[in-house]
Amino acid sequence: MKMKIRITVAALLFAVSAHAADYLPPPGDAWETRRPAREGFDAAKLKAAIDFAVAHETKLFPALDGTVDPRDLRVTIPLQFAGPFSDPIGPLKPHAPLNGIVIRHGYIVAEWGDTRAVDMAHSATKTFLSATAGVAFDQHMIRDVNDRVLDYVHPSSDFELAHNQPITWDEMLRQTSGWVGTMWGKPWWADRPGKNPWDELAAGPPPVGKEWKYSDVRVNALALALTHLWKRPLPDVLKQYVMDPIGASNDWHWEGYDNSWITLDGQRIHVVPGGGHWGGGMFISARDLARMGLLGLNNGRWGDKQILSDAWIKLSKTPTGPNTGYGYMNWFLNTDRKLAPAARADSVMFLGNGDNIVFIDYEHDVVAVVRWIDDGEKAEFVRLLEAALAK
């Protein structure tokens, strides 16, 4: 059946219109919609961008069409990340068909598919993880991001290794820590190995702070450190200080691994990961992802509340030395115009496998969420979206 695309109808003509920058959706499911033209979009071109996205839903293994459901992550994730120590240890589930939402000036101008479906966000989870670090920074629980992690917490014996002792919060947040050790049965060298599974093990530990490596093991080490810092489950921290203040639903949930339980100050705490590489991570709807995108668009502010400080957002958007396309996790930057050549250099994306995309265009006051688009097509979607804006 052809997917129905909803290009929204105008709000009531007699409604008093607030200044665009002043509108934010209230808590719950109510979210004001506007016709694309009213918010500066060419409706036909916007529909073309959406049609493109729908036509390019990801299929990780086309050869398996007709054999397995390509949306069943219980099958595709173990195949995608097959390698040493790659068995899933957290929940996986089938995901909804491709869906998305486009926001301008805070209003929904387009929405398609099931944007209320609660699905895995994969590495977009890292954006929520770094937000819990941001709240800790803003509350002076982390005095300086260039302080050593060990100056605050001692999460495991691996953190005490001589190689790991100099590692700072900033390096962990930028994925330049070079942390070595094992997290929940997954050794550092086995995550996204090179041509040979043993390449990184043979090469030895990378220098701290000098190399950028996308590593869920190291991300999970940060999650453990932050759990020790907060002395409570990170989903509770996120809910109290971020998700509830921005009016998110109660449908999202952040899942840990089967074996990621610790006892801290007499409490039994489930430590959550920063992605879905081995299952688990954030399960969330496109609508709630859009709220997080709006928080990013507004530089950490939601109405009269500064949820994440200007200083934290500035750090999040500061390019990382070894990889200028990356800030704090998981702020992918367009500094070199490689991520999205058609967008401005100051635009950003929160990205997760699948692909799960939260695109933020600061100049045009736009947030777009697209879930389950082919990784190689996200830049073209952004080009079509930008082309739909009236000049």
Where on the chain are the PLM-derived regions?
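Active-site-proximal alpha-helical segments within enzyme catalytic domains
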Residues: 127, 131, 218-225, 280-301, ...
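Catalytic-site signature segments of enzymes, centered on catalytic residues
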Residues: 108-117, 179-259, 280
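Active-site Gly/Thr loop motif
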Residues: 261-276, 317-367
